[in-house]
Amino acid sequence: DDTREAIESVAPGRATVAVTLRPSPAEPLGDGSVAFFTTAPPERASSLAERLEADVVAVVPALSDRQALREALARDDVAAAGTFLVEVKAAAIEVVCEYAAEHGIRVVFCDNVPEPIDGEPDLDAALLELASEAVALRA
């Protein structure tokens, strides 16, 4: 609601679509165990991991904290994973991917795809409408 109010204050009448970001692996994760490294807050990270079609054995919501990543990599559940699913962030590359390379663990990069929350308008339609308006203004 605060975000909608802020948008309305600078762009009255502009359509808004509340979304959540869903993890989207760059390639299939397969049948092995997966450790999921994400920037999502701890209270959301586990529910996002549940949406993955994979055997997620560990969730690490600390991608911006190199020390926390090192501590997580020392955990048995993380170290035992056959695949690391990793959002692309500097610390993830420097710490997690380096560890994976040294230990023969497969890395799959993860994107975050916006999905409208239930009851919200279609995001693609709203974006197309906004793009059409922008093009019309430049014509």
Per-segment meaning from a language model:
Residues 11-139:
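P-loop NTP-binding site
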